[in-house]
UniProtKB/Swiss-Prot annotation:
It is a multi-pass membrane protein. This is Probable ABC transporter permease protein MG189 homolog. It holds the Pfam family BPD_transp_1. Belongs to the binding-protein-dependent transport system permease family. MalFG subfamily. Gene3D superfamilies: MetI-like.
Length: 319
């Protein structure tokens, strides 16, 4: 019996050795070089797909009016460095006010969404409470509805609350309405809170920690990566929103950066027909660059902190 087992073991060792030899042969210098070339080509291809739209935007923004109006093909090279296009879109004096209102709406949307979704996620992460399954089913059912289907109800709430008057400060609350709550963000926080080992909560309560203190001092810091993810998604949604501000601010492009971009580059009066109004694409591209500039600045200032927070994992071992 022992001899037969030894024979089977030797055969197993020989098979493993052959497999190892094949692996070593497969990792020859030619295969490694081909793999490196393939990865480089793929990375360059997708890198160009990301960079090319920004390059095209910058080229068009620096092109003169004559070339933009007469060209019949895509502009891949500018006819000069017409930086005066940026000065022309800033002449109306509405850019800074639109940036300020947009920033205020974005910050307020992040704060309110974190407040509601963190509370929702933590509540549904608790083990048992009455009607938990019923409320969770109702919240998940909301995910079936598209965002456009909710606009009518949201607009009705804003009108009843009198938050749709652009000349009043309450318009800020009206602009933040669609971004205050999110079932998807609440689902993310629920999953993050449920991933915390139960022994941490048990140890905290043994040490005399109350429920609120445990939530603020232990549970919430441990879902920091989810907090940053929700904040980033909310910031992009609030900053790039167009349809909702268009409903509330039809004639006030100075209160939203995207409406300000839409209003730029039209050479004509309101009384003229569509054929008489010229659209200067270079001015629109210049305005678009100025619109995304604040987000780029914020990202480059906090990129290390954002990447560190998103990539971090909470320590689940009590020290």
């Amino acid at each position: 019996m022992f001899k037969q087992s030894l024979i089977w073991y030797n055969r197993y060792v020989q098979k493993r050795k052959k497999g190892l030899d094949l692996t070593i042969k497969d990792r020859s210098w030619s295969n490694v070089l081909l793999g490196l070339i393939f990865k480089t080509v793929v990375l360059c291809f997708f890198g160009l797909m990301v960079i090319f739209p920004f390059y095209l935007m910058l080229v068009v923004a620096l092109t003169s009016d004559e070339v933009v109006l007469n060209i019949r093909e895509p502009i891949l090279k500018s006819d000069g460095w017409h930086f005066e296009n940026f000065r022309r879109v800033l002449e109306d004096g509405k850019y800074l006010n639109a940036i300020w209102i947009n920033s205020l709406v974005t910050i307020l949307s992040i704060i309110l969404r974190l407040f509601f979704t963190v509370s929702m996620g933590y509540a549904f992460s608790l083990k048992k409470w009455k009607l938990k399954k019923l409320f969770w089913f109702i919240f998940l059912a909301v995910l079936i509805l598209p965002e456009s289907a909710l606009l009518i109800g949201q607009y009705r709430v804003v009108v009843v609350a009198n938050w749709n008057q652009p000349e009043k400060p309450a318009i800020i609350l009206g602009l933040t309405m669609p971004f205050v709550a999110s079932v998807f963000s609440g689902f993310m926080f629920r999953t993050a809170f449920e991933a915390i080992p139960p022994r941490i909560k048990e140890s905290a309560f043994v040490d005399g920690c109350t429920g609120l203190r445990y939530f603020l001092k232990i549970a919430f810091p441990m879902v920091r990566s989810t907090t940053w993810t929700v904040s980033i998604l909310t910031a992009f949604a609030a900053w790039n929103s167009y349809l909702w501000p268009l409903l509330l601010l039809t004639n006030r492009p100075d209160l939203n950066i995207n409406l300000w971009v839409l209003a730029q580059g039209t050479d004509g009066n309101a009384g003229q027909s569509d054929e008489q109004i010229r659209v200067l694409l270079n001015l629109k591209m210049a305005a678009a660059i100025l619109a995304i500039l604040p987000m780029f600045i914020v990202y480059f200032l906090f990129r290390k902190r954002i990447m560190k927070a998103v990539g971090s994992r909470a320590n689940t071992i009590k020290g």
